[in-house]
Amino acid sequence: MKLQEAVRLRILELCQNRKTTVGRLCVECGITPSTLHNITSGRNRSTTLATIQRLCVGLDISLPAFFDSEYFDNLEL
């Protein structure tokens, strides 16, 4: 799996686990809906660490907790 796909799946998983929507997450973390939609739809090919950090703030988790998922275990280089 590529990194961008792992990030996309992790965001969707965290939203589902917290019973929130991607739209609500935009409000919580201050990311534009178009940016988050591009990430979660797979159109964005280069999500920055700064964006992931903002998502973590909105999700109330640490950056290491975001990456603590089997999605990131066997990434393609």
Label every model-predicted segment:
Residues 1, 38, 67-77:
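Short, charged recognition helix plus adjacent turn
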Residues 1-21:
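A short, Lys/Arg-rich alpha-helix, primarily the initiator
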Residues 11, 25, 36-39, 66:
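Conserved hydrophobic/aromatic packing and binding residues within compact polymer-binding modules
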Residues 15, 26, 56:
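The alpha-helix within a helix-turn-helix
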Residues 31-46:
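Recognition helix of helix-turn-helix/homeodomain-like DNA-binding domains
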Residues 43-57:
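Short, basic-rich loop-to-helix N-cap that marks the start of a DNA-contacting helix
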